[in-house]
Amino acid sequence: MLVDAGMSVGFHTLDHPVLTQLPDAEVSRALTLGRGALAEAVGAGITLFAYPHGRVDSRVASHVPKAGYRAALRSGQRPVGPTSNLFLLGRWEPGPLGVRDLIAEAALRLNYPIGAP
């Protein structure tokens, strides 16, 4: 239903470990264990990943494309441009505002009226 409505669904691991504290084999396992079940549940492939706790280093980031993801998000609102590393993208977090307020704020910052085509 979400995917049919144009939403993207990403994976975030099953048990939310701090990946930077895990050995390589466990990082690889965390990136894949449960991903298939999520893909089946949403009826679409899962190609986006969000690092648990927003914590990532170059070693962990190197595992993500090997696991078949196209991009990954970490904590922190960072600008994204044509030369941005797709596996170290910042993400906007709703925080205390909530999703509805976050969307309205983003629309204002982009000077894009809500409900516009």
Give short role names for the model-derived ranges.
Residues 12:
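A short, exposed helix-loop element centered on a Lys and neighboring polar residues
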Residues 1-4, 8, 17-117:
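C-terminal active-site subregion of NodB/CE4 polysaccharide deacetylases
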